[in-house]
């Protein structure tokens, strides 16, 4: 097996740069710089030299096989964050026999192949690297720490127990077996179905935390939607004008709202129009607004809006409060009046939804669980039809186990790895 190396920290000037090596020759490669090797898992300051020239001073860390991120013999060099110093060390490593530069995500791939991580943990690590908000960080850390794998192992153990009971019934079908295992198997299946359905119910919110919530600003033309978006973004994200119908496409602004990733959508003003381009913009606005997690209806004096109705959690506010006195939730994007209250109300509604978030953060996770649920529902139906259907029930149990195995990467993993590791940096 090749020994791989890569810069694990960001490129460019920095206080420290971290080079990572993994593979059978990683310790030998460090020794090539003319330094005595420190004890495993103990940092030591060493002067790296090559052909009699000092390249840099570095903290050197060595890890043994089975006790590193990848599960292989590994090493880290903590250099000064000088691009020139980093390049000089990389140049030496590139010329050593048995070493090559790592591909994107290759360190993590080796951790997966060596059983240090399961597939769900790999996805959690990718989400942790991409996390922009506190809620995303917490959720990704939970998955990376093995929350999905731990649950999958418990579910799998119960399924294997149920399968063993059924297989015993099949094996001794021609003998006088006094015990009917159907009640025990049904108890196991019913408990599992309840757990898995709860996970699926919470997966939609978990996926929204990962991908971000969408909040659509809806109203008539010239109601102040773009001005409100600019006030929320604290910059000129959208063009504002006294001319009605200025916004014709959906403008998106992503924000961190109380630790949640939220994309605000400034949509075209809703009205009847003969302008083809504007009508297309209105059609798109209605589609995006209906699909959004929450809508803010910005009212003016133009009357009710057509094409979309207010849902239970939506916010209805009176716009242009600086020009129109009134009661209730009122705001002005121009002066900022009411904007903090609106942000607080949006945050309260979205945070309330996250309380039910589960551990399944990706569509792949949810689909695997839904397949397992479908298989277990078939098991239940077959058992209730009588013991003559035990073999069919056993086949469905095996199908449920395979679905859970795909969740953590025991089966059907290779086709997913390219997509997952494409988002990783070289040093990860």
From Swiss-Prot:
Grouped into one coarse class, the protein's main location is cytoplasm
Name the top EC class.
hydrolase
Q: Which gene encodes it?
A: mnmE
One biological-process term from Gene Ontology? tRNA wobble uridine modification
By its UniProt entry, which Pfam families does this protein fall under? Answer: MMR_HSR1 (PF01926), MnmE_helical (PF12631), TrmE_N (PF10396)
| Entry note: cofactor | Binds 1 potassium ion per subunit.
Q: Which cofactor does it need?
A: K(+)
Q: Which GO terms describe its molecular function?
A: GTP binding; GTPase activity; metal ion binding
Provide the binding site for (6S)-5-formyl-5,6,7,8-tetrahydrofolate.
Answer: 20, 76, 116, 428
- Which family, according to the similarity comment? Belongs to the TRAFAC class TrmE-Era-EngA-EngB-Septin-like GTPase superfamily. TrmE GTPase family.
Q: Where does the chain bind Mg(2+)?
A: 226, 247
| Protein name listed in UniProt | tRNA modification GTPase MnmE
| Alphabetic keyword roster | Cytoplasm, GTP-binding, Hydrolase, Magnesium, Metal-binding, Nucleotide-binding, Potassium, tRNA processing
Source organism per entry reads Cereibacter sphaeroides (strain ATCC 17023 / DSM 158 / JCM 6121 / CCUG 31486 / LMG 2827 / NBRC 12203 / NCIMB 8253 / ATH 2.4.1.) (Rhodobacter sphaeroides)
């Amino acid at each position: 097996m090749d020994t791989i190396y890569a810069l694990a920290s960001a490129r460019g000037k920095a206080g420290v740069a971290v080079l990572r090596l993994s593979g059978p020759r990683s310790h030998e490669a460090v020794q090539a710089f003319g330094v005595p090797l420190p004890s495993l898992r103990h940092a030591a300051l060493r002067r790296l030299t090559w052909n009699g020239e000092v390249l840099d001073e570095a903290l050197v860390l060595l890890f043994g096989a089975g006790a590193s991120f990848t599960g292989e013999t590994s090493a880290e060099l903590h250099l000064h964050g000088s691009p020139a110093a980093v390049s000089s060390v990389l140049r030496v490593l590139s010329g050593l026999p048995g070493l090559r530069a790592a591909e994107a995500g290759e360190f993590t791939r080796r951790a997966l192949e060596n059983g240090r991580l399961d597939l769900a943990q790999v996805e959690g690590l990718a989400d942790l690297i991409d996390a922009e908000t506190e809620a995303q960080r917490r959720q990704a850390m939970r998955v990376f720490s093995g929350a999905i794998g731990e649950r999958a192992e418990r579910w799998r153990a119960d399924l294997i127990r149920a399968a063993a009971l059924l297989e015993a019934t099949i094996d001794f079908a021609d003998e006088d077996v006094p015990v009917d295992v159907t009640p025990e198997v049904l108890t196991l299946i019913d408990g599992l179905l309840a757990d898995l359905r709860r996970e699926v119910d919470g997966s939609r919110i978990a996926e929204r935390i990962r991908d971000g919530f969408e909040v659509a600003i809806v109203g008539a033309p010239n109601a102040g939607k773009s001005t409100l978006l600019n006030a929320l973004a604290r910059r000129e994200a959208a063009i504002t004008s006294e001319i009605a119908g200025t916004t014709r496409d959906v403008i998106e602004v992503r924000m961190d709202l109380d630790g949640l990733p939220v994309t605000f959508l400034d949509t075209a003003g809703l009205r009847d129009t003969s302008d083809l381009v504007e009508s297309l913009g209105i059609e798109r606005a209605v589609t995006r607004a209906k699909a959004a997690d929450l809508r803010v209806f910005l009212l003016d004096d133009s009357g009710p809006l057509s094409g979309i109705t207010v849902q239970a959690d939506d916010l209805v506010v009176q716009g242009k409060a600086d020009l129109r006195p009134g009661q209730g939730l009122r705001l002005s994007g121009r002066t900022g009046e009411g904007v903090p209250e609106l942000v607080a109300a949006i945050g309260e509604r979205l945070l309330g939804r996250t309380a039910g978030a589960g551990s399944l953060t990706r569509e792949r996770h949810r689909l695997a669980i839904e397949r397992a649920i479908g298989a277990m529902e078939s098991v239940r139906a077959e058992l209730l039809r009588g013991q003559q259907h035990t073999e069919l029930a056993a086949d469905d149990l095996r199908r449920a186990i395979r679905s859970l195995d795909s969740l953590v990467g025991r089966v059907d993993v290779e086709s997913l790895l390219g997509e997952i590791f494409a988002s990783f940096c070289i040093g990860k």
